[in-house]
Design a protein with these regions (language model features):
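Conserved GTPase G-domain substructure that encodes guanine base recognition and part of the catalytic core
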Residues: 1-239
Length: 239
């Protein structure tokens, strides 16, 4: 059976946790507030489809430390946690964005996860949420494909993963309608085997990867190094 490990990332409020819940059949809490709710990266239990075993990791938002969900001093702990969950590598990255203009946060998320953390070695697709007002939903991608041409996305997948509220009867079938093509894109675009970011068979150790990723995190979020952060980085020894 083919093993596919997927890292899902995106700015606060893009619907990545709702997307992960729908793909996995789980019910992790979601929040539409500005502060978000993904304060810690979460590894969902693996599920099977089409002779594939799929594991999904929902990441803490890159900008949530500055927006109140994750204190700055805890950010390094969350990066360590994410890197530990990356021990077995990834087969695919899924960036989640709303059906709107390309934001600064979108660019920074892409640079951090695609170019820096995984160094362009793992394919990435874009899941576009909020397409429920389009008919068909693919029309948004048709109109906006060119705007995303500067990114190395293998595919843009229009989706609706909204849930709850008075429109739930409208959202529910659209979530199911979105799940099948997104899963198909994941299976089609994922590497045959997960690719490791560090350790045996790579040119990087855990601590080298952590230092490189942390430096980029600081550059993107403009956090100053604090003594607490430096102590956590310097004292950490991977298991």
């Amino acid at each position: 059976m083919r093993n596919i490990r997927v890292l899902v990332f995106g700015a606060t409020g893009t619907g990545k946790t709702s997307l992960c819940n729908t793909l996995t059949g789980r019910k992790r809490p979601t929040d539409n507030g500005a502060r978000g709710i993904t304060a810690k990266s979460h590894l969902y239990p693996a599920f099977q489809t089409d002779d594939c075993r799929i594991e999904i990791i929902d990441t803490v938002g890159l900008h949530e430390s500055s927006q109140g969900t994750v204190p700055a001093e805890q950010a390094v702990v969350e990066l360590i946690d994410l890197l530990e969950k990356a021990r077995d590598g990834f087969s695919l990255l899924v960036q989640v964005t709303r059906a709107s203009r390309i934001t600064k946060e979108h660019d920074e998320d892409y640079k951090f996860f695609v170019e820096k953390m995984t160094q362009g070695n793992i394919p990435v697709i874009l899941a576009v949420t909020g397409c429920e007002n389009e008919y068909p939903m693919t029309s948004w991608v048709d109109r906006n494909q060119e705007a995303f041409s500067r990114f190395a996305y293998k595919e843009l997948v229009p989706t609706c993963f909204a849930s709850g509220g008075p429109m739930e009867e409208f959202f529910a079938p659209l979530r199911l309608q979105s799940r099948e093509p997104l899963l198909g894109s994941i299976i089609h675009n994922a590497l045959v085997e997960p690719r490791k970011l560090y350790g045996t068979g790579t040119s990087s150790s855990f601590n080298q990867s952590l230092t490189r990723i942390w430096n980029e995190f600081v550059a993107v979020t403009a956090y100053p190094y604090t003594q607490v952060m430096l102590h956590k980085l310097n004292a950490y020894v991977p298991l």
